Amino acid sequence: MTSYHAMAHRGDVGNGEDVVVHGLGGIGLSAVHIANALGANVIGVDLFDEKLDKAESLGAVETVNASEVDDAAKEVQDITNGGADCSVDALGIETTCLNAVNSLKKGGRHVQVGLTTSEEAGQVPLPTDEFVAKEIDFRGSLGLQPSRYSEMLDMIKTGKLDPTELVSETISIDEVPDKLAAMSDYDTMGIPVCSDFS
């Protein structure tokens, strides 16, 4: 739901647009899947090949391993011949936010989904002059209003979206605390689902 609102409403992603998603955890991979379903050419950026491979299986046309390049934003600029129409920071750390913003073309839209960590404490320095010179929009995104659930559910019903592709594993209620801790350490891929409440 969070990624649907970010892509369909706040990012206003359209058919044929270039969309780059920085940070391929559960939210980021969901954003890849949804942007692809909306007709975008999606680029996934992360540090881990396993997450990049998953992004490709969800529809990313290109991926960038940020640990293997000097400048992830420049890689995206090169892939898109000048920058993405829409960027997403699904992680919330300074590096991913700046890389996402710097991946945009003139007139691009940045969607901030990831909340910052304790290190950033809600503050990330941004290239303000670039926002002005390139007329970049910065948009926050949080959740999905219940009145808009039907849009997303219709895409699931018609097969454009398949949430089961995002499920990384099923876990018991006893495993939830450890999985939540692993998410805080960015040590998960996809979305674990609790299916055993006994």
Language model features by range: what are they?
Residues 82, 98-102, 145-198:
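C-terminal hydrophobic helical "lid"/dimerization subdomain
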Residues 21-24, 44-45, 64-66, 85-89, ...:
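Glycine- and other small-residue-rich loops at beta-strand/loop junctions that grip anionic moieties
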Residues 13, 80, 91, 102-105:
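A generic alpha-to-beta junction signature in SAM-dependent methyltransferases
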Residues 18, 41, 83-85, 109:
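Structural signature of beta-strand start/N-cap positions in the alpha/beta core
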Residues 94-158, 196-198:
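Glycine-rich phosphate-binding loop and adjacent beta-alpha segment
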Residues 1-69, 74:
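Mid-domain Rossmann-like dinucleotide-binding core that forms the NAD(H)/NADP(H) cofactor-binding site
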Residues 70-87:
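A short acidic, Gly/Pro-enriched loop at the edge of an enzyme's catalytic core
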